[in-house]
Amino acid sequence: MHHHFYIYIYLVLLAINNSAITATTVADSEPMIFNEDVIDEFIENEIQQGFPGAALIVTRFGQVLKQSVYGYKLKYDENATIIKEPQLVTLDTMFDLASLTKMYATNYALMHLVEQGALNVDDPVKKYIPQYSGCNPKNECREARLIKDLLTHTAGYAPSVGFYNPASVPPDLFSQEKNKTEEIIETKLEFQRPRGGDQIPLYSDIDYMLLGLVVEHISGMSIDQYVANNIYQKLDLKHTLFNPLNTNNNYQKSDFAATELNGNTRNHTISFPNVRTHVLQGEVHDEKSFYSMHGLSGHAGLFSNLYDMSILTQIMLNDGTYGNVKFWSKNIQDLFLTPYPYDPTFGLGWRLNRNKSLSWFGLHASDDAYGHTGWTGTCTVIDPKYSMAITLLTNKRHTPCINGTFDGEKYETGKYGKIMTLVYESMLLHKDSPEKL
């Protein structure tokens, strides 16, 4: 069984109830070419083959061109058995964004703080986190690390550290308590390699855990409070938040796309104290976020849905504004989109389509396109050349896991690039056709 909803909206009509995506460019009255059936057929075919669920929204010139959902938000139980009545993805379904948190929470907070004059990316981290000091025997010192080193993933940290698992870290790095984890990251965690300079970036969650703490130190608020107060509430976003199942929120498990079938055990092959074994639905999957940071971290923990993501991506297309609210200026946004010299696919946090090496941008995204992906199965591509944003949310990890590999990983929908390619081709925005702008 499969389905999709198609909504074609001129958002000017929705301005009455403040739900319009406001853009600096207004579309012509004639409809744009969009042969979307090929996208639907492709994803629905993969759903029939076993891909769990997906949600796709495409906006152009501030107009929603496509908003479609496919498959199931909940399909399996913890025994990897297909349940009697799988729950369909709906337009409201919220997804665990995983590393999209780095952009749509942490980077948005950082760009906003730069706009306020409260943060300079060329400053040492220590300016904002006074206890961030000390050197290792190779004289690699925390004092030398700049905010932009964290943003470009060149500070020298390991890609990940299993703080939550006593079998994977020394005793002094073990933590399932947020305050202790913060202390470890700020004062104990060693560098794996030298700082930046001419180094190729090494993508690291630790960089963004620290950047989340920078936001908290500057603002005196937790990361979730800061983005809620300064960004999400100003946009009236109701479905973008951390720890959404907390009692003060009105959400329940069935509002979410499920992820791993056996908690964090990879089909019962991994165990550590307090490990979850149930189907995850509405709880952040990421172990460092859930166990070590109580769901509030700069690298993972944010949930959102299609509509809210279309608003959040539109801010970037609008150079930092939405409606009459200015979050940051264009020059600050341009700074965060500056390619890192030794790997131009890295900006300040953002991933860039500069040398076409990131397959998830697809074949036709412009050189100016940028975005990010999330481990759970999420991807955004923002392409200012075409005034277009594409958000693809999937729950590809909500599939059986064999020898550490999730069945959902084998499908093109969960690799993103094929879907991005089809979006461009369905709008005739590719090399072999006259561009319709």
Predicted regions and their residues:
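Short, gly/Ser/Thr-rich active-site loops of penicillin-recognizing serine hydrolases
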Residues: 318, 324, 331-335, 339-342, ...
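Short, conserved catalytic-motif segment at the N-terminal edge
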Residues: 31-95, 118, 401-403
